[in-house]
UniProtKB/Swiss-Prot annotation:
InterPro entries cross-referenced by the UniProt entry: GCS_T (IPR006223), GCS_T_bac (IPR022903), GCST_C (IPR013977), GCV_T_N (IPR006222), GcvT/YgfZ/DmdA (IPR028896), GcvT/YgfZ_C (IPR029043), TrmE/GcvT_dom1 (IPR027266)
Stored NCBIfam families: gcvT, PRK00389.1
Pfam families found in the cross-reference section: GCV_T, GCV_T_C
Subunit structure: The glycine cleavage system is composed of four proteins: P, T, L and H.
UniProt function note: The glycine cleavage system catalyzes the degradation of glycine.
Source organism (scientific name): Shouchella clausii (strain KSM-K16) (Alkalihalobacillus clausii)
UniProt-listed SUPFAM superfamilies: Aminomethyltransferase beta-barrel domain (SSF101790), Folate-binding domain (SSF103025)
Name of the protein: Aminomethyltransferase
Enzyme class: transferase
Catalyzed chemical reaction(s): N(6)-[(R)-S(8)-aminomethyldihydrolipoyl]-L-lysyl-[protein] + (6S)-5,6,7,8-tetrahydrofolate = N(6)-[(R)-dihydrolipoyl]-L-lysyl-[protein] + (6R)-5,10-methylene-5,6,7,8-tetrahydrofolate + NH4(+)
Gene that specifies this protein: gcvT
Any one biological process term the GO annotation gives: glycine decarboxylation via glycine cleavage system
């Protein structure tokens, strides 16, 4: 029997727009509207609008919310103020990654966790199995839609729809009940593209109206609706990990290069702390590195990588970078094959093609 794909509240809108949809973790989502490269360049140069409503939202509330979360996540939530967000990971005892997530502090007893779509149920089960005391978990994923407006002109586009001075919401800060075109929104200065921008959490029933308002407001600025294809090439160029590729139960946050989100010295003990502390102190045995192809070919997820004839790892993500026009990839490689300018080989369809280790991120926006 065929499993029915899940749809976001905006499905009808992108169906009408002629978007090409794909199965993404059980969701029927647009891969592109007008073309991946066109959408990618719109975000790098102007702005793009994404439907990210497949992401999960979990409220964690109560007097014991903070202590419970501190024991689950790798970053230090005690450093957060109200209306501040923080990038985080949850790990197993051995240091593998359960998921990467954003934690929003609404107040000292109320947090919003944003989870990867494919992991919503397993994450909630993991959290539920590890919390105790006065804490409640409320899954609000189905009633919450999430739109992302990203790019150098994102703020200007959104400012036309609200009286709220959006420039006052600093990166990784958020404000609740901001009115955009008379729709109440939680507006967060976060994103997954390497550009400035906002993520807008809204009631599912208001999502279509907000989408239309942003598209109309963005037209004079060159804003385009964007699909998963551009979202992936954008995050890849900025070296932002994708769960299931750069991060898995077998790959730690340290190996994946997000050690900044792992505070092994925070006062609260957390799951995976000892394993991650050891990796930080001794250096991980594997590292995520960037490669650029020397020979012609595109490194794709799962391709094996060789150094001096030895298998040293695999490609986690790879593509022809729309911004650079080069064939580049991210590789989880043994540490002794990870130095910049190291010559590697990628096995592409049975042939070993030359590549070299390069600095990442492949793209960094100028402030």
């Amino acid at each position: 029997m065929e499993t029915k794909l899940l749809r976001t509240p905006l499905y009808e809108l992108y169906d009408q727009a002629g978007a090409k949809t794909v199965d993404f973790g059980g969701w029927e989502l647009p891969v592109s509207f007008s073309g991946i490269k066109k959408e990618h360049h719109a975000v790098r140069n102007a702005a793009g609008l994404f439907d990210v409503s497949h992401m999960g939202e979990l409220l964690v509330e109560g007097p014991d919310a903070l202590n419970n979360l501190q024991a689950l996540v790798t970053n230090d939530l005690s450093k957060l103020q109200d209306n501040q967000a923080q990038y985080n990971a949850m790990c197993t005892e051995s240091g593998g990654t359960v998921d990467d997530l954003i934690v929003y502090r609404r107040n000292e007893n109320a947090y919003l966790l944003v989870l990867n779509a494919a992991n919503i149920q397993s994450d909630i089960e993991w959290i539920r199995a590890h919390v105790s005391g006065q804490v409640t978990l409320t899954d609000i994923s189905n009633e919450t839609a999430l739109l992302a407006v990203q790019g150098p002109k994102a703020l200007a586009v959104l400012q036309t729809l609200t009286d709220e001075p959006l420039s006052e919401i600093r990166p990784f800060r958020f404000k609740e009940n901001v009115m955009f075109a008379a729709i109440p929104v939680l507006a967060s200065r976060t994103g997954y593209t390497g550009e400035d921008g906002f993520e807008l959490y809204v009631k599912a029933g208001d999502a279509a109206e907000l989408w239309r308002a942003i598209l109309a407001a963005g037209e004079p600025f060159g804003l385009l609706p964007c699909g998963l294809g551009a979202r992936d090439t954008l995050r890849f160029e900025a070296r932002l990990p994708l769960y299931g590729q750069e991060l898995t139960k077998d790959i730690s946050p340290i190996e994946a290069g997000i050690g900044f989100a792992v505070k092994t010295d925070k006062q609260a003990a957390f799951i995976g702390q000892q394993a991650l502390k050891k990796q930080k102190e001794q250096g991980p045995s594997r590292k995520l590195v960037g490669i650029e192809m020397v020979d012609r070919g595109i490194p794709r997820t799962g391709y094996r990588v060789f150094y001096q004839g030895q298998d040293v790892g695999f490609v986690t993500s790879g593509t022809q970078s729309p911004t650079l026009g080069k064939n580049v990839g991210l590789v989880l490689a043994k540490a002794d094959a990870a130095a910049i300018d190291t010559e590697l080989e990628v096995e592409v369809r049975g042939k070993r093609l030359r590549a070299r280790v390069v600095k990442t991120p492949f793209y960094k926006r100028t402030k």
